[in-house]
């Protein structure tokens, strides 16, 4: 039924604020999003938002809904230098966070991320990011069973690319994902060499190496 669907799981045994009511033929609920931000050509931009989806919210034919029963708050702040300075043509830095609760008031997860990108005056390009997922609680992992606590993780990557307008250009990069309590480790390294003898022809060689444990 709709009450037992993956968007709700009203049958969860530890959810005292919701339950399956077999007499209902439809659900009622509400949802909304409020955003406040600054979007312009200025150096500093930001956005903060709150999204609410009550447990009984149902879109029906309006669109697909992955989940309900959530209160989400997120904020991002960006610093963007568009004009050349020092050795850079431009520079972009962004940091953000997300927090999720259910309608019982239980904090489900906290995520933070910082990322940057820049082009140098020699037209080389660099970007990277760092993401932290704190210890979190999932109401859906057991598909209708009780909530389960999941360990957090840290992810990061860095990429560098030479001038793409040249006939020969290259890129190197790496990714590292690490679960808390040594739950998992994943490391990947890659490089690429691209040769473009003419506009209609491009040849590339892109080996990679990964380690997982």
What are these regions (language model features)?
Residues 2-213:
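Exposed, low-structure sequence patches enriched in small/polar residues
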């Amino acid at each position: 039924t709709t009450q037992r669907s993956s968007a709700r799981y009203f049958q969860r045994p530890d959810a005292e604020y919701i339950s399956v009511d077999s007499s209902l033929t439809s659900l009622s609920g509400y949802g909304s999003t409020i955003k406040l931000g600054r979007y312009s050509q200025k150096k500093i931009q930001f956005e903060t938002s709150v999204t609410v989806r009550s447990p009984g919210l149902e879109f029906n034919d309006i669109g697909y809904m992955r989940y309900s029963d959530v209160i989400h708050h997120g904020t991002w702040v960006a610093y963007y230098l568009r004009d050349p300075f020092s050795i850079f043509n431009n520079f972009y830095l962004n940091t953000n966070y997300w927090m999720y609760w259910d309608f019982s008031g239980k904090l489900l997860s906290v995520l933070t991320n910082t990322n940057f990108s820049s082009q140098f005056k020699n037209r080389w390009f660099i970007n990277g990011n760092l993401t932290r997922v704190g210890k979190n609680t999932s109401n859906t992992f057991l598909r209708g069973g009780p909530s389960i606590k999941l360990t957090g993780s840290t992810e990061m990557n860095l990429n560098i690319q030479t001038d793409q307008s040249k006939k020969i250009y290259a890129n190197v990069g790496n990714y590292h994902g690490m679960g808390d309590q040594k739950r998992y480790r994943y490391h990947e390294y890659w490089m690429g060499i691209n040769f473009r003898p003419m506009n209609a022809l491009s040849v590339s060689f892109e080996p990679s190496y990964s380690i997982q444990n």
